[in-house]
Amino acid sequence: MKIPNIRLQNQQLLNPLFCQPKELVSWLGAMQAQNYSMVKWAVGMRLKSATIQTVEEALRKGEILRTHVMRPTWHLVAAEDIRWMLKLSARRIKSANDSFAKGYNLEITDELYAKSYNLLEKILCGNKSLTKQEIAEHFCCSGILVEADNHRMTRFMVRAEQEGIVCS
């Protein structure tokens, strides 16, 4: 077999093996998912038979997760794999997050991160889903943020992902 065909087969683009998005994503380990619309197509085209709704349903149910598990880039991972992956990568991601924050003079104390985690748990309790902007409004009302600052808000959310508190 030629190398291009082996690659297509391993990427599940030739004779796909899986029917469900979570099976595929788990088998691959992770899929880069920076562009949300395109990653749904990327998953769907690697399944035996799927629609965009099949992939959206797996995301909505939390069977596959879109998160920053490997680096500050979005990836899809199977829900059952997220904890062990976070254990492997969280320290490095936290370090990169902190370095980025310092570069923008956005140093955030551990105390403030802890306060943000408590608020996130409170406002997202019961599988509630909020946008980053809606969460930022809660952070402003509670005094965690003085104003809705996207860079600072991103630091809070990336750190909360690494702690396993939220998953996008």
PLM regions and their residue ranges:
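Nucleic-acid-contacting surfaces of polymerase cores and analogous helical-repeat interfaces
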Residues: 100-106, 161-168
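Hydrophobic mid-domain F-helix/FG-region of cytochrome P450s
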Residues: 149, 160-161
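Short, hydrophobic-biased segments on the C-terminal half of alpha helices
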Residues: 55-56, 154-158
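Phosphate-backbone binding and catalysis cores of DNA-processing enzymes
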Residues: 1-149
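Toprim catalytic domain recognition across nucleic-acid enzymes
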Residues: 146-154, 166
